Amino acid sequence: MMRQGTSPSKLYLPKIKDAPLTIFEYVCKKFHHIGTEVWQKRFNDGLVKDLDGRVLDLNSPYQHGMTITYYRHLCDEVVVPFEHHIIYEDQTLLVVDKPHFLMVSPAGDYVQQTLLTRLKQTTGNPHLSPAHRLDKDTAGLMIFTKTCESRCAYQSLFNDRQINKIYHAIAPMTQAHQFPLQVLLPLVRGEPFYTMAVGAGEPNTHTDIDILAVSEDGKLAKYELKPTTGKLHQLRVHLNYLGIPIAHDSFYPKVIHRAKDDFDKPLQLLAKHLSFIDPITNKPMAFESGFELDFSKV
């Protein structure tokens, strides 16, 4: 059952040595970073239940093999003042244009202000699930599956690289490289941990890059990016590696911390086009984002 557009999280209670007396004690230790007062409020508000829907309280005993469900406490979130747009829907698919600054799925400090929660609220469908990733800072096309039965088929398209993806990005114009070109790099986790870096060894990422347009003053270019792999931050790292970091990138070449309500400088990266053969109907599908990147906004 959904609550304000969010589905409950599930937690299995394992058999452990020196098990706590209560479920409350266990979750407080397991999720110590959350805070005892937060869990106390969840129990007091009736947000923690067993799989049969029975409400658990602070004194409910710990029983290994049991599965509990709980809703994250919805704190006051910074409202993302940009709207998504549904551009296609059928019995199994929902294709959406995601604005900049909006996370796809709940994580960290974001629950309500995510695309998935918004869609669950407006459609009433608790089975919606993203078929792939898209950074919070990136705008453009997102595919969601509408049924549990279809989820694996569409996620496999991305995992098996059966999707044609085209991105647009605005970055400095350069004479140091001749376009079109290919970038093949080995990417690894960077420092801080939420960034990526160029490592050693065989390349595990591949992007074809070309120039679509140049600004009137010749300082900026709009690049067309065609990744054949889908590593985290791949396009951002590839352009930064070429010495042309994407405009308004707060991670590359260096991390810049911005306030959560700072919406002035969106990352100039857009998931513009997706095409594939539908695994259910075997029909060719192609979608284009209605958003555009504009030199005047940089």
Question: What are these regions, as identified by a protein language model?
Answer:
Residues 1-298:
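RNA pseudouridine synthases
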